[in-house]
Amino acid sequence: MVTSAAIDCDIHPGVPDIKGLLPYMSEFWQDSFTHRGIDGFDLMSYPLNAPITCRPDWRAKGKRPGASLDALRTEALDAFGIGTAICNPLTGGQVAVSETMGAAICSAVNDWVREHWLDQEPRLRASIVVPAQAPLLAAEEIERCAADRRFVQVLMPVACEMMLGRSYYWPIWEAAARHKLPVGLHAGSMYRYAPTSTGWPSHYLHDYVAQSQAFEDQLLSLISNGVFNKFPDLMFVMIESGVTWLPGFLWRAIKTWRGVRGEVPWVSRSPAEIIRDNVRLTVQPFDAPADATIVEKIVNQIDDDRMLLFASDYPHWQFSSEEDPLPPGLSPALAQRIRVDNPLATYPRLQETV
């Protein structure tokens, strides 16, 4: 059943510390984490006390941002008229150096989300959190969770140990494609390498702004290494990438491809055509002034109404309006596409469950 209510493609449940995940782990990992005294495993992409991590009026004293399901219902689902929302848990399991430890944490997070969020709120769906540092284990986790149709996407950080077009990652793409699950690439890094091409940032400001570079690099890696040739129906969703980098990237990718396409003969279509067919972006953060004229110009440069997906990014503090996560200047028809039609077309399982 299709609903006119909005579909939020990016909300973040507050994942508990390791102690809260132990019940979802094997006896071996319970003993290992306990005896080694490992409890916190938080990502540095969103430090818990950073202002951007949680809007001030959504921050509950003594609780992790996004930890309360009741608050999510009131502050996001009801406030924004959301009929369905996709949970994208951010967990240190996705960046652990130990592949098996990372896989254990990711599996525990998926089972925790299933029990504490999906089973408790019928409007919620979730992404399968996978250990991208271990593609074979990631593929196994996709197989384990895919039978639950409430899992609608595969989730991993955009900056991993190497470029995502490399065949090393293809077991993940193959498993996702087989189950018709989009792959969500979320802003964030394993920090195996500097997040910029010229070295390590000195401040969070620099690290955060540099994230758009990773999205550009990985997108071109996927194209030039033939991922979309091998998996022509696989969809990638750029989550929290910002949007305004895309028009300039499209122009430069097309221009350069025309000049050196002999190097990559398997890329038989324009990068822009591939991106418009196989890539989507969430609208928060939009990374543009709250100026309707500027927003309209950017949307016109993207030149495809299918590409943008509604997202509040709850509880992160990304947009200035307290009423609507959508940027200003969108026509009613385009706003409807972004809120409902595009998410339904991007996530096949939502067509079954919305």
Where are these regions (language model features)?
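Helix-coil boundary/capping segments in enzymes
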Residues: 1-354
